[in-house]
């Protein structure tokens, strides 16, 4: 497949997104007005939720997103750990190293510079409303405002995917 064929295929696939964007716009209008800009662009000063008769759908989505985050990532208890893919390689030294690496990963994720909590909270809201989030993880090497390299988590708007 050459570049021209790949470009043609991408244009065809993205051209079929129109109906999906309209569906997401309708869902967002009713359940997630903060993200209701799939098919329109907001101007400063626009009212974004003035069409809602009640805030109940928005509150239900927010509550569901909060519950998803609480169940999947309880901040008070460790919710993940590293293990070897081959159980036979799990000896005392490897367990100690994996425990250390798990702690290092947890500290990197919950470092305020990583924005992990914010990205996951946005992702939980996207999942509650649309059934899927778009989350990326990056390694930032040269940020003069931070001390050394760190992870950066971002939740992207589905319209941009």
Predicted regions mapped to residue ranges:
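Extended, helix-rich architectural segments
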Residues: 1-161
């Amino acid at each position: 497949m050459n570049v021209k064929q790949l470009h043609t295929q991408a244009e065809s696939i993205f051209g079929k997104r129109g109906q999906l964007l309209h569906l997401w716009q309708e869902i967002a209008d009713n359940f997630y007005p903060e993200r209701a800009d799939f098919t329109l662009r907001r101007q400063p000063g626009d009212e974004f939720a003035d069409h809602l008769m009640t805030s109940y759908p928005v509150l239900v989505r927010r509550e569901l997103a909060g519950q998803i985050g609480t169940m999947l990532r309880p901040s008070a208890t460790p919710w993940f750990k590293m293990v070897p893919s081959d159980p036979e390689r799990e000896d005392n030294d490897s367990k100690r190293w994996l425990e250390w690496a798990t702690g290092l990963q947890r500290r990197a994720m919950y470092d305020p510079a990583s924005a992990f909590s914010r990205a996951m909270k946005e992702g939980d809201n996207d999942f509650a409303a649309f059934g899927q989030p778009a989350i990326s993880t990056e390694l930032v090497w040269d940020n003069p405002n931070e001390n050394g390299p760190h992870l950066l988590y971002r939740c992207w708007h589905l319209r941009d995917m």
